[in-house]
């Protein structure tokens, strides 16, 4: 092991450490970071070389953050990334600095985003917040309005998690929805993701995602937002139901097929009579 360590350059060590961090299960970033820190045994190298991994993890996970002085949390996503460690809170029209390692927001300041699309963004946000409140007890959503390739675009992100370390499991739901504002009809493109880690007496992870695309009639802001929520609700319900049904099927068939209920002899061993069996006598004489 020592020989292998000597063969690895600092760059290779950081690359390996970064992969561990990026793939940390939801709610377990600190545990993975501390383990990697012990393995690398070089804090400066880890902080400088793997800083991009800290940021990528938070962006990928839709990490929610509370900004002092503001009631609602905001999600850390690529759509709100303003560069130089600053992020956008479109609801409160502010930008703030975000520490990817400590997961803390500081220095909130006023920020004016795309005013031309703000009425659409606000309508979608109002409808989405009501939906998230109803379906996700711990849910957070952030809605962005921006120009992409010259087209006015709405991007809605949802995150909800349950971290139960004392019960040896953590899980996170994420979904992202995007559509452009075009006359008559547009397409809603969505991606839904579930990640769950269970680690009591074992180590099992569920990592699943689904891509969707549905037509959305475009009229006024409020009505379009209502139709958008119908699409989101239908797709998320269908995905969650499919996951549940698939797990039931796996429980009834796949998992049971992994081992025999009886040994090859088709008979169970009576452990109280083990000494009368041939194997018991052989063990006794050994």
Curated annotation (Swiss-Prot):
InterPro entries: CapZ_alpha (IPR002189), CapZ_alpha/beta (IPR037282), CapZ_alpha/beta_2 (IPR042276), CapZ_alpha_1 (IPR042489), F-actin_cap_asu_CS (IPR017865). PANTHER family: F-ACTIN-CAPPING PROTEIN SUBUNIT ALPHA (PTHR10653), F-ACTIN-CAPPING PROTEIN SUBUNIT ALPHA-2 (PTHR10653:SF2). GO terms for biological process: actin cytoskeleton organization; barbed-end actin filament capping. GO terms for cellular component: brush border; cortical cytoskeleton; F-actin capping protein complex; membrane. Transmembrane segments: none annotated. The modification N-acetylalanine is found at residue 2. GO terms for molecular function: actin filament binding. The modification Phosphoserine is found at residue 9. Component of the F-actin capping complex, composed of a heterodimer of an alpha and a beta subunit. Component of the WASH complex, composed of F-actin-capping protein subunit alpha (CAPZA1, CAPZA2 or CAPZA3), F-actin-capping protein subunit beta (CAPZB), WASHC1, WASHC2, WASHC3, WASHC4 and WASHC5. Interacts with RCSD1/CAPZIP. It comes from Rhinolophus ferrumequinum (Greater horseshoe bat). Disulfide bonds: none annotated. This is F-actin-capping protein subunit alpha-2.
């Amino acid at each position: 092991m020592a020989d292998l360590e000597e063969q690895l350059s600092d760059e290779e060590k950081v690359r390996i450490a970064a992969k561990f961090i990026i793939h940390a299960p939801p709610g377990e970033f600190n545990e993975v970071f501390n383990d990697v820190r012990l393995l690398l045994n070089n804090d400066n190298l880890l902080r400088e070389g793997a800083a991009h991994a800290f940021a990528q993890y938070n962006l990928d996970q839709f990490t929610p953050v509370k900004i002092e002085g503001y009631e609602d949390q905001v999600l850390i996503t690529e759509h709100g990334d303003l560069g130089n460690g600053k992020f956008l809170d479109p609801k409160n029209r502010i930008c703030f600095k975000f520490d990817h390692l400590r997961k803390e927001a500081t220095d909130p300041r006023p920020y004016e985003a795309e005013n031309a699309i703000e009425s659409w963004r606000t309508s979608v946000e109002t409808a989405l917040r009501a939906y998230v409140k109803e379906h996700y007890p711990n849910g957070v959503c952030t809605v962005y309005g921006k120009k992409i390739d010259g087209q006015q675009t709405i991007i809605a992100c949802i995150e909800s998690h349950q971290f139960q370390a004392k019960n040896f499991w953590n899980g996170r739901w994420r979904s992202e929805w995007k559509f452009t504002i075009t006359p008559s009809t547009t397409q809603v493109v969505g991606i839904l993701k579930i990640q769950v880690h269970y680690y009591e007496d074992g180590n099992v992870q569920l990592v699943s995602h689904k891509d969707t695309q549905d037509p959305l009639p475009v009229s006024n802001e409020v009505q379009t937002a209502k139709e958008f929520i119908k699409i989101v609700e239908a797709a998320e319900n269908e995905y969650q139901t499919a996951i549940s049904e698939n797990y039931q099927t796996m429980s009834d068939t796949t998992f049971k097929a992994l081992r025999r209920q009886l040994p090859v002899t088709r008979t169970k061993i009576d452990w109280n009579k083990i000494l009368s069996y041939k194997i018991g006598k052989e063990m006794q004489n050994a």
